[in-house]
Curated annotation (Swiss-Prot):
The lineage of its organism: Bacteria, Pseudomonadati, Pseudomonadota, Gammaproteobacteria, Alteromonadales. This is Aminomethyltransferase. GO terms for cellular component: cytosol; glycine cleavage complex. One of its GO terms (biological process) is glycine decarboxylation via glycine cleavage system. It comes from Shewanella denitrificans (strain OS217 / ATCC BAA-1090 / DSM 15013). HAMAP family: GcvT. GO terms for molecular function: aminomethyltransferase activity; transaminase activity. Belongs to the GcvT family. The glycine cleavage system is composed of four proteins: P, T, L and H. It catalyses: N(6)-[(R)-S(8)-aminomethyldihydrolipoyl]-L-lysyl-[protein] + (6S)-5,6,7,8-tetrahydrofolate = N(6)-[(R)-dihydrolipoyl]-L-lysyl-[protein] + (6R)-5,10-methylene-5,6,7,8-tetrahydrofolate + NH4(+).
Length: 364
């Protein structure tokens, strides 16, 4: 029996095509994935992300615990509401999950983790928290709606209370705050401006309907995937997992090496991997016809004239650009050109940093 979010019936009302997503009944699309994608790039769209796991970490050791648990450093967070992105690593520096952590106070942090990794994450967090004076509280009674796109904030403003609107006025990216019953964050998974709104389950249907009434288009998992890939954002389980370290997943920027005496889980293994050199995650662009897909082999010749091989982790047709894009894990010596094997022949692709579209425009 699949889990259903509190918005399940709202999806059916909008004629969603429902699919199983890691044990959850979720909307794939509401008729046209392409239209939903363009709505987010050009106007405003919304996603039910209530399957995500919200965890509150509280107690006198909350800060010290998260400094041990995460490769990024929550000590960087000094302004209430500020958030950071990073990886939770195992002892071998494999990525258990990627997550966002909000700093609410020195004794209260909010962590949002992926749904597919929920049980594994909660077990790991519980185990690692044992020596610390902290309380780990999962918040299943909270739903979450992401409102994304160039007009998302303006449309959300029409459903917020005056108090909520003044609270979010001028809020910078990667912040979150509680106002009334809503936790409103300037985060997202699309490369557009907008909010991720955590809402009590009993209020979620009304909020969804109010956003629908202001012309925010409901969007499914299909558009969510093409949008995040255009933005060069990783999907856990495809672009990285426990067999991959963050340096090989374009997450090097999320590792806080300083201060050097912060002994986060996985640090020793990661230091060794960094010294050895690792593979890297790059972006691929193919302007010829065809679609780059997960697991297709990638070939290039290194500076010594030796052929090297990698593979595509995520690939799709980019509705914004009009051709195919992908992320690929490859040996570090790759240049600006490579080849992908598709339909038994090799096709030339451009190699770029993995960011294709930001704020509606080509990013490379």
């Amino acid at each position: 029996m699949a889990n259903k979010t509190v918005l399940f019936h709202k999806h059916l009302e909008s004629n969603a095509k429902m699919v199983d997503f890691h044990g959850w009944d979720m909307p794939l699309n509401y008729g046209s994935q392409i239209e939903e994608h363009h709505a987010v790039r050009q106007d405003a769209g919304m996603f039910d992300v209530s399957h995500m796991t919200v965890v509150d970490v509280t107690g006198q050791d909350a800060r010290d615990f998260l400094r041990k648990l995460l490769a990024n450093d929550v000590a960087k967070l000094t302004v209430p509401g500020k958030a950071l992105y990073g990886g939770m690593l195992d002892d071998n520096a494999g990525v258990i999950d990627d997550l966002i952590t909000y700093y609410l106070s020195d004794t209260h942090y909010r962590v949002v983790v992926n749904s597919a990794t929920r049980e594994k994450d909660l077990a790991w967090i519980a185990k690692q928290s044992a020596p610390f004076s902290v309380t780990i509280t999962e918040r299943p009674e909270l739903a979450m709606i992401a409102v994304q796109g160039p007009n998302a904030k303006a449309k959300a403003a029409t459903v917020f209370t005056p108090e909520q609107n003044s609270a979010v006025e001028g809020m910078k990216p990667f912040f979150g705050l509680q106002s009334g019953s809503l936790f409103i964050a300037t985060t997202g998974y699309t490369g557009e401006a907008g909010y991720e709104i955590i809402v009590p389950e009993q209020d979620a249907e009304d909020l969804w309907q109010a956003l629908l009434n202001t012309g925010v288009k409901p969007c499914g998992l299909g558009a969510r995937d093409t949008l995040r890939l255009e933005a060069g954002m990783n999907l856990y389980g495809l672009d990285m997992d426990e067999s991959i370290n963050p340096l090989a997943a374009n997450m090097g920027w999320t590792i806080a090496w300083e201060p050097s005496d912060r002994d986060f889980i996985g640090r020793a293994a990661l230091t060794e991997l960094k010294a050895q050199g690792t593979e890297k995650l790059v972006g691929l662009v193919m302007e010829e016809k065809g679609v780059l897909r997960h697991d297709m082999p990638v070939f290039f010749t290194d500076s010594d004239g030796v052929e090297q091989q990698g593979y595509i982790t995520s690939g799709t047709f980019s509705p914004t650009l009009g051709y195919s894009i992908a992320m690929a894990r490859v040996p570090a010596g790759i240049g600006a050109i490579a080849e992908v094997e598709m339909r038994k022949k090799r096709v030339a692709v451009k190699v770029i940093a993995p960011s294709f579209v930001r704020n509606g425009k080509q990013a490379f």
